[in-house]
């Protein structure tokens, strides 16, 4: 069987209801730069959403870079993750991390929610 590493629409949290579901009773995992809120879903696959505020990451290009790298990391780890809904919250200082360090931080966080 060939494993797909695509990132289709059904792997994203899109509606306010989906976000509210996670914010209601989240399981938290944190580092100094990122907090992951997670909650088991009824689907057979994980989904991801972002809440990266302008207050914590001033410039749009930094927010976009963080989301792009996080999406890519999620895409590569999706088959090892439990069927949960994830919301990524960025803290102050995350924009100072280079790509390798950010990937290492995300790797550590994904391990907490893998099979």
UniProtKB/Swiss-Prot annotation:
One of its GO terms (biological process) is tRNA 5'-leader removal. Its EC number is 3.1.26.5. It comes from the Bacteria. InterPro entries: Ribosomal_Su5_D2-typ_SF, Ribsml_uS5_D2-typ_fold_subgr, RNase_P, RNase_P_CS. This is Ribonuclease P protein component. PANTHER family: RIBONUCLEASE P PROTEIN COMPONENT (PTHR33992:SF1). Keywords: Endonuclease, Hydrolase, Nuclease, RNA-binding, tRNA processing. GO terms for cellular component: ribonuclease P complex. Belongs to the RnpA family. It catalyses: Endonucleolytic cleavage of RNA, removing 5'-extranucleotides from tRNA precursor. The lineage of its organism: Bacteria, Pseudomonadati, Pseudomonadota, Gammaproteobacteria, Enterobacterales. Pfam families: Ribonuclease_P. Consists of a catalytic RNA component (M1 or rnpB) and a protein subunit. It comes from Hamiltonella defensa subsp. Acyrthosiphon pisum (strain 5AT). The keyword Secreted does not apply. GO terms for molecular function: 3'-tRNA processing endoribonuclease activity; ribonuclease P activity; tRNA binding. RNaseP catalyzes the removal of the 5'-leader sequence from pre-tRNA to produce the mature 5'-terminus. It can also cleave other RNA substrates such as 4.5S RNA. The protein component plays an auxiliary but essential role in vivo by binding to the 5'-leader sequence and broadening the substrate specificity of the ribozyme.
């Amino acid at each position: 069987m060939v494993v797909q590493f695509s990132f289709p629409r059904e792997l994203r949290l899109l509606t306010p209801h989906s976000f509210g579901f996670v914010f209601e009773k989240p399981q938290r995992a944190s580092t100094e730069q990122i907090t992951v809120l997670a909650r088991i879903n009824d689907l057979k696959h994980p989904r991801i959403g972002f809440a990266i505020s302008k207050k914590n990451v001033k410039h749009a290009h930094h927010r976009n870079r963080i989301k792009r790298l996080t999406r890519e990391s999620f895409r590569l780890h999706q088959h090892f993750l439990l069927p949960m809904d994830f919301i990524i919250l960025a803290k102050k200082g995350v924009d100072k991390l280079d790509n390798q360090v950010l990937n290492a931080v995300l790797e550590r966080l994904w391990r907490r929610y893998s099979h």
